[in-house]
Amino acid sequence: MRVRSGDDPAVDDPENSTFSNRVGRDPSHRLRPAATPRARVRSGPMRITTVGCGYLGAVYAASMASIGHEVLGLDVDQKKIDDLNKGIAPFHEPGFEKVLTEALASGRLRFSTDYADAADYQVHVICVGTPQQINGSGADLTYVHAAVDALIPHLDKCPDGRSLLVGRSTVPVGTAQILAQKLKDAGTDTLLAWNPEFLREGFAVKDTLYPDRIVYGLPDGEAEAAEAKALLDEVYKPMLKADTPLVTGNYPTAELVKVSANSFLATKISFINAVAEVCEATGGDVSVIAEAIGLDDRIGPKFLRAGVGFGGGCLPKDIRAFMARAGELGAGEALSFLREVDMVNNRRRDHVVNLSREMLGGSFTGKRIAVLGAAFKPDSDDTRQSPALYVASKLSGRGADVTVTDPAANERVRTERPNLKVAEDAFEAAKDAELVLLLTEWDEFKELDPVALKEVVAEARFIDGRNVLNPAAWREAGWDYRSMGRP
């Protein structure tokens, strides 16, 4: 069920710690027939814990504190907690450090490793990672269960009333029901809801404060659903007053919303990359094709840029976990197409490796190659499943002398890939290079002067793995320029 009362999603400046309430929700929209909640709902700011202070949890904690809630961030990593309490961001995310330091200064945000501190808080939000299993494709739920187990002894103690456990981590369908049973078996009266996140790295603060939709997965019982919804409505009160669309359903629906969204986005990316493969065989221009089909309002232009493929900690993992879970449930055939989505994505990375070999005359041995980009996307330092690092490592492993540069991820490269050289900027990386590859579309790489860069390389060969440069300008400057599915 969707709750909405207008079409204007605009909200006021989040720095004011409140949002506009000029657009209210239509009271005729209700989740279920009226029920009297047993949970007491605080009038005003809620007391919220976030369990897990990585990328998702830390951003959520600081953002919730910035709109007036009292927030405690919990994590087992003492150094991370110490840094966060000092206002030091453990990752690169535009706008996060400012929100973090302001929330700390307000006194509404603190971080701790002691789960006993959670006893005074009413809403507990699970934000831990669910990585791919080491020996399989499914999601590893170790951290989710550990977080809930650590919280259970401290639930039912909040003076504000009945507690609510909220899942935001991306999990296989059926996980919420297992956790609900875990709470019941432990004898706690705590409610459970699922509230999937839809954050984009590079836009995480904006996506938390100005979400394009909010999804609740609620218990089946009418009274418990009403109680859980009342507490969540208070958490998201500023956003709901600003007419953010609200979609409600049961646990499996909410769990499936997130993996379905990510699978659709991955499918769209792999589709245009498959078209790029056909263009490379026929002389077609995938960029023109993407523009033309993107003008169809049933399709839209987003996620239609061909390139070296997608990466990160979500899309690759989520489509594999979705397929694995569907197989466990006997519905594997329904998602068999996602296997090809994954294969197309991996094939594009190998295509760049093969194109590099071709441009270098058939051998990588001793060849100097510059790779521009290491993070899986711009405005992030996240190198998980990074296409850029995959390609760089493949080239290095086949005998090339590879130098990588990234505006935010250089330190991660030094730590994670010590076999790769690291440069501070594109010109340093490209010095005496025989091939330059652009694999993460940072603005500073898109704005490179082809004439100036040609002055520092040994051979003017360039692969634009993100289709973000002007082919004519680079060729006019004397480069052997190649891109993905463009003539």
Predicted features along the sequence, with ranges:
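Intrinsically disordered, low-complexity proline-rich regions
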Residues: 1-45, 367
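Structural/interface elements that position substrates and couple domains in central-metabolism enzymes
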Residues: 33, 37-487
